[in-house]
């Protein structure tokens, strides 16, 4: 009750550690020893030249007795993992042997521990200034990413070596185009009857200059090709026939024999419409073409319909409903034509 516990500040503890930690601990740690703690008789054990004391004159034992009773620790030092009070972790660990002085030195490379502060900074700075990976995230996000590689490629590139290859490719392309043109000429000469109708491909499609070898191959298949889709003239044109057909070129009417006509009339009386199988058999028997028999049946149906005057039953049904009425009414012009035709017949007679 009467004695007050002294709690030193952080500044006094720092002075205490800097003034009294003069010797380096080289002995084994109690954690790795088989005995509870280091023995003073053993070589290499930790020994302190003088008891720890603060600049204010208060001994460390007096500071420790008020906060950390000695009865708490069975072996004379705090156990592993013990939570020290605020301000005493470093001093208590050194006093108990858990912490050696070398552990207070910052972890640096082996060759830099013995060097001065300036050399340490220099080594660390050189390690931090190492060249980053070529494809790391930092290098990719840099604004000059890819510039160095492009410059190296430009230096090592040799455009002059590729010129002979391009020349060889151009010569091969020209040979192929000449072969295609020759084939087109022969085809056009064979297809057309007159040589004047064949266009001159050399005039329409002149050979390409040597500069054309700079273009890729697909260009020659589009713009520079001689196909109709390229916008230029085709390889060979088919001459259009004249619309005015002479009478000699008209198809002559089929002259049926008496036997053929009698057989066709007989078949027409039986059935006015022919099936495909029946039409083929009839054409084989009569020695005619199927189209000739088909047209003859169509003409006879039209004649019969015109002579009988009968209308289609479907047309009659629609006319009864008022939906269909194609009946014609004779006009005055038609009557005048009939009168003139009758007068002409009377004069001829």
UniProtKB/Swiss-Prot annotation:
GO terms for molecular function: DNA-binding transcription factor activity, RNA polymerase II-specific; RNA polymerase II cis-regulatory region sequence-specific DNA binding. It is found in: Nucleus. InterPro entries: Engrailed_Homeobox_TFs, HD, HD_engrailed, HD_metazoa, Homeobox-engrailed_C-terminal, Homeobox-engrailed_CS, Homeobox_CS, Homeodomain-like_sf. Keywords: Developmental protein, DNA-binding, Homeobox, Nucleus. SMART domains: HOX. Its main location: nucleus. GO terms for cellular component: nucleus. SUPFAM superfamilies: Homeodomain-like. Residues 173-188, 242-252 have a biased composition (Basic and acidic residues). The keyword Phosphoprotein does not apply. This is Homeobox protein engrailed. The lineage of its organism: Eukaryota, Metazoa, Ecdysozoa, Arthropoda, Crustacea.
